[in-house]
């Protein structure tokens, strides 16, 4: 049933962005549910649905073939900082360019405290794959490392990013991100935020399951719902 809920959300038309934003006006109560109405054939039907809907990704939906190595090209702008990076994360010999990674780490820094933490290089490789898939488009970073986040968050462990791309629907971005999930040693958590208009992508510790969710709460959605996602373990090298 949960799979059907998420599938239905992804099946909405490209014009669904304004409808998604209108969801912020729906009544969200303290129990983590909201009133959602549909109009079919002139008949209006309303029900209360969970603001947060999540599930482990089915193994059958995960990628079975190895991921191609990305070009390494990255173009990303941190929205809250007004700073951007455009360059390559690899050296000519194919190894990681530590100077480029350091610049990205700085872009990922906590916007409240200014703290910087080394971000998982695998996350930057996924960022490059997204850039390769949407050539010529800049990725906007909504949130990266968050020092003040609870330690169960992947943002706290510097292994997550909230992103969007101008003129690319978040559903299209979400769908492509799903193709990057190989499970097992490279599991991803991927979340869709229709009201705030971004997706979340995180790199998970070995043995953690791939996870998918849709969160209808907005920036003013109140406290987070209990059980909204699984506790994070710090990814290890």
Where are each of the predicted segments found?
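N-terminal secretory targeting signals
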Residues: 1-70, 219-237
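Catalytic cores and adjacent binding grooves of peptidoglycan-active enzymes
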Residues: 20-29, 34-38, 77, 152-161, ...
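Envelope-exposed proteins and targeting segments
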Residues: 70-72, 100-105, 135-137, 159, ...
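Second-shell loop/turn segments in exported
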Residues: 72, 108-120, 160-166, 209
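A mature extracytoplasmic/lumenal domain signature
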Residues: 78-80, 89-91, 143-146, 165-167, ...
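Active-site acidic/histidine clusters and adjacent loop/turn architecture
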Residues: 80-81, 85-136
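Short, surface-exposed glycine/acidic/tryptophan-bearing loops
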Residues: 98-99, 142-160
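Surface-exposed patches in mature extracellular/periplasmic domains of secreted proteins
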Residues: 115-118, 136-145, 187-194
């Amino acid at each position: 049933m949960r799979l059907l809920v998420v599938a239905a959300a992804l099946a909405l038309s490209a014009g669904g962005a304004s409808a998604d934003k209108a969801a912020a006006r729906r009544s969200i109560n303290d129990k983590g549910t909201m009133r959602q109405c549909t109009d079919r054939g002139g008949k209006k039907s309303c029900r209360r649905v969970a603001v947060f809907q999540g599930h482990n990704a089915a193994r059958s939906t995960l990628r079975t073939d190895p991921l191609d190595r990305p070009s390494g090209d990255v173009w990303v702008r941190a929205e809250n900082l007004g700073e951007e990076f455009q360059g390559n994360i690899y050296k000519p010999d194919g190894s990681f360019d530590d100077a480029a990674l350091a610049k990205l780490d700085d872009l990922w820094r906590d916007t409240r405290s200014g703290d910087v933490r080394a971000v998982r290089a695998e996350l930057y490789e996924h960022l490059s794959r997204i850039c390769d898939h949407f050539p010529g488009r800049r990725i906007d970073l909504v949130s990266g490392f968050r020092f003040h986040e609870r330690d169960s968050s992947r943002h706290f462990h510097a292994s997550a990013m909230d992103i969007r791309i101008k003129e690319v629907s978040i559903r299209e971005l979400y769908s492509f991100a799903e193709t990057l999930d190989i499970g097992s040693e490279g599991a991803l958590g991927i979340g869709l935020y229709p009201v705030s208009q971004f997706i979340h992508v995180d790199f998970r510790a070995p043995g953690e399951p791939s996870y998918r969710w849709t969160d209808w709460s907005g920036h003013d959605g109140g406290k987070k719902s209990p059980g909204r996602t699984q506790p994070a373990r710090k990814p290890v090298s």
